[in-house]
């Protein structure tokens, strides 16, 4: 089952592209009409020979098409894909193997994380802390219950292979001087029922090779196994013993047996006889409490969905800082049985405050994801088993474990190579930073679009030739699309994004702060560029090729320095911070500067340029740099005001 829902980024970019496309096409048509009208009404084109008329009309058409090329963000999808691809490669170094490209950004929009307990919050290094025996006829039977009713192994170095819980039992047996391999060789397996999250127990029918005695061995969740046991073999204090173990964050396991003559498991008769109860410790990962706190401070709700008991899950939640005894109550946790029995309406009223879902089945996890999505949440969910595949598919972001099954990995969007919750928090930071970098790219592009459109409109009505040629526009477009995308995509993630709340699903990718910046910088560009054209028209009557070369170079270097404004947008630090380590960003700057120099010095008639003197280059570079210096001064002032407001609080 797949949700088939578009990602938040995809919806926003589609809407933005359509809006910009409509405006760009409308303005290009307007420019074409103005140019044709001026040619016929002002320049007397109607009386010119038809070959000249055709040439002028085609030239006007080419200018209009070039305007569409500049205004319409046809390179936006490619640029975003480039950003996502670069992020995928870099996230791999932080133990996040991105399997589906869109997941890079979607993690930044996540509002709820439904996480497993074992291995993700804990170390998955289980160790049997205590085994309480109950009326065993001999110790051999307990050893067989551990060794034969298991699919795990110990390697040559004594490390467990297979299920971690079963591996912990084998390690305990070895510490008790038991030989699990010899015990296995001493019995014949007649039938086996492997563990499943639905049954919550495992059963193996064995026959001893020496005595031909047959036993059905069972191990699993205490409440399931005890329900099948003879009450006479179950001591009254066992519930208190189990609860005491669980309150210490121990996983509990019950072992039972029954002598039988059956050849198949279903033929064996109940009730069983309780053999022992095991308490298994699985310590919390050291880095998890800080990661959970970081996610919670970022406005992300964390919910534990586990097959363990409520007491065990609650203690783990307490250790990682998710559960507060002074604030949280039974309303903040549910068992799988309660969850299954509740209606969707009841759950919708409760899941917002739910923190723990214990004794949960995979279908419970999928249902929880579906209900959270109905409430408008963007949900990330973890899973490592084959049965987790539906929930991984249905979630906005499915997170499989590096130690999980291939089915779970194929169904997921990201694989956590180290299985740790810390990597989930890191993925959120990457996703938010990626979204911010995409905003910076759009900010850069729309600022240039705004200035270019206004300059083109003004140039089309002025008594002068177009300030930029078609070839110059194409070079500007390369800067706006490919090079700027590379520069913004190369920026490293920033921890500051984890101090913000998740963005709203319906929020426009163009924020109010971006609109203010676009309007401010774009207006400055327009004033500078139109001021140059107006001054030349006033002083010389018609701009010379040298003056238009200066105009073209000024336009490009305004973009050059505006890259710093885009880099510093919402950065929380100076735009120059860390620039020495941003090799891609520096390379892009060098390519723009070198490319512009080559075009001006060698472009000739193709680019309508003439070589400039070093003094002219110095004036252009120096004066256009004021756009970056001014932007940095404004951002520094805002940061100081923000810090003052925080101190006042």
Over which residues does each language-model region extend?
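Generic alpha-helical transmembrane segments
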Residues: 480, 525-526, 549-564
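Transmembrane alpha-helix entry/boundary detector in multi-pass membrane proteins
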Residues: 544-548
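Long hydrophobic segments that form regular secondary structure
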Residues: 534-543
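Alpha-helical transmembrane segments of multi-pass integral membrane proteins
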Residues: 517-532, 557-558
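Conserved cytosolic headpiece of P-type ATPases
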Residues: 1-502, 509-510, 523, 538, ...
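Membrane-embedded alpha-helical transmembrane segments of multi-pass integral membrane proteins
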Residues: 34, 528, 558-561, 595
């Amino acid at each position: 089952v797949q949700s088939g829902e578009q990602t938040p980024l995809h919806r926003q970019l589609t809407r933005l592209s359509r809006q910009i496309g409509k405006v760009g096409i409308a303005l290009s048509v307007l420019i074409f009409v103005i140019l044709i009208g001026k040619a016929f009404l002002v320049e007397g084109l109607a009386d010119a020979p038809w070959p000249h008329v055709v040439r002028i009309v085609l030239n006007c058409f080419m200018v209009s098409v070039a305007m569409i090329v500049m205004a319409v963000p046809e390179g936006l999808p490619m640029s975003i894909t480039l950003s996502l691809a670069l992020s995928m490669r870099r996230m791999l170094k932080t133990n996040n193997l991105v399997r589906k490209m869109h997941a890079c950004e979607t993690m930044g929009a996540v509002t709820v994380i439904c996480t497993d307990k074992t291995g993700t919050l804990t170390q998955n290094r289980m160790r049997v802390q205590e085994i309480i025996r109950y009326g065993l006829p001999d110790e051999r039977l307990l050893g067989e219950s551990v060794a034969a009713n298991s699919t795990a192994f110990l390697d040559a170095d004594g490390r467990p292979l297979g299920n971690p819980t079963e591996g912990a039992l084998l390690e305990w047996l070895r510490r008790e001087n038991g030989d699990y391999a010899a015990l296995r060789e001493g019995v014949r397996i007649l039938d086996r029922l492997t563990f499943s999250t639905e049954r919550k127990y495992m059963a193996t029918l064995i026959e001893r090779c020496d005595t031909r005695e047959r036993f059905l061995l069972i191990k699993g969740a205490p409440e399931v196994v005890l329900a099948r046991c003879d009450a006479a073999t179950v001591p009254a204090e066992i519930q208190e013993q189990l609860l005491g173990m669980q309150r210490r964050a121990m996983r509990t396991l019950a072992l039972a047996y029954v002598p039988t003559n059956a050849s198949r498991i279903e033929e064996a008769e109940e009730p069983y006889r309780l053999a022992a109860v095991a308490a298994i410790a699985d310590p919390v990962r050291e880095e998890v409490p800080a990661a959970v706190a970081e996610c919670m401070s970022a406005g992300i709700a964390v919910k534990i969905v586990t097959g363990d008991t409520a007491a065990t899950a609650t203690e783990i939640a307490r250790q990682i800082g998710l559960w507060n005894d002074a604030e949280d109550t039974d309303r903040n946790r549910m068992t799988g049985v309660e969850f299954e029995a509740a209606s969707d309406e009841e759950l919708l009223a409760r899941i917002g405050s739910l923190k723990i879902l214990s004794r949960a089945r995979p279908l419970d996890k999928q249902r929880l994801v579906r209900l959270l999505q109905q409430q408008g949440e963007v949900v990330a969910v973890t899973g490592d088993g084959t049965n987790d595949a539906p929930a991984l598919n249905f979630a906005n972001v499915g997170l499989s474990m590096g130690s999980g099954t291939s089915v779970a990995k194929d169904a997921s969007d990201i694989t956590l190579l180290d299985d740790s919750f810390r990597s989930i928090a890191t993925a959120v930071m990457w996703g938010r930073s990626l979204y911010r970098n995409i905003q910076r790219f759009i900010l850069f592009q729309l600022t240039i679009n705004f200035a270019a459109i206004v300059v083109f409109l003004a140039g089309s009505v002025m008594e002068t030739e177009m300030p930029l040629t078609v070839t110059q526009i194409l070079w500007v477009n390369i800067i706006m699309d490919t090079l700027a995308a590379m520069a913004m995509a190369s920026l490293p993630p920033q921890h500051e994004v984890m101090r913000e709340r998740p963005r709203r699903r319906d929020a426009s990718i163009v924020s109010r702060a971006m609109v203010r910046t676009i309007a401010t910088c774009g207006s400055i560009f327009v004033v500078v560029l139109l001021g140059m054209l107006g001054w030349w028209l006033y002083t010389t009557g018609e701009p010379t090729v040298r003056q238009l070369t200066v105009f073209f170079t000024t336009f490009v270097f305004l973009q050059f320095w505006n890259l710093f404004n885009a880099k510093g947008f919402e950065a929380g630090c100076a735009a120059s911070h860390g620039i020495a380590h941003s090799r891609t960003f520096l390379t892009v700057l060098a390519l723009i500067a070198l490319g512009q120099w080559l075009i001006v010095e060698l472009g000739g008639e193709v680019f309508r340029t003439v070589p400039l003197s070093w003094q002219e280059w110095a004036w252009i570079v120096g004066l256009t740099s004021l756009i970056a210096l001014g932007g940095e001064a404004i951002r520094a002032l805002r940061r100081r005001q923000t810090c003052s407001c925080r101190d006042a609080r």
